[in-house]
Structures are given as C-alpha cells and as structure tokens.
C-alpha cells in the first residue's frame, strides 16, 4: 500500500480524461 502525490495526480488525470470523453 503506497500512495504518493504523483499517484494521486495520475489518478486525477485519468479521471479527468474519462470525463473529457
């Protein structure tokens, strides 16, 4: 279990991309 700012940002970006679709 490892959570880093980068990981969180990546998830946020992925969500944004899905929303953009």
From Swiss-Prot:
Biased segments, Acidic residues type: 1-11
Keywords: Adaptive immunity, Blood coagulation, Coiled coil, Disulfide bond, Glycoprotein, Hemostasis, Immunity, Innate immunity, Pyrrolidone carboxylic acid, Secreted, Sulfation
Pyrrolidone carboxylic acid found at: 1
Bias type Basic and acidic residues, positions: 12-21
Chief location: secreted
Signal peptide residue numbers: none
Glycosylation sites: 4
Superkingdom as given in the UniProt entry: Eukaryota
Region (Disordered) location: 1-21
Function: Cleaved by the protease thrombin to yield monomers which, together with fibrinogen alpha (FGA) and fibrinogen gamma (FGG), polymerize to form an insoluble fibrin matrix. Fibrin has a major function in hemostasis as one of the primary components of blood clots. In addition, functions during the early stages of wound repair to stabilize the lesion and guide cell migration during re-epithelialization. Was originally thought to be essential for platelet aggregation, based on in vitro studies using anticoagulated blood.
Subunit description: Heterohexamer; disulfide linked. Contains 2 sets of 3 non-identical chains (alpha, beta and gamma). The 2 heterotrimers are in head to head conformation with the N-termini in a small central domain.
Name the record gives this protein: Fibrinogen beta chain
Organism annotation: Cervus elaphus
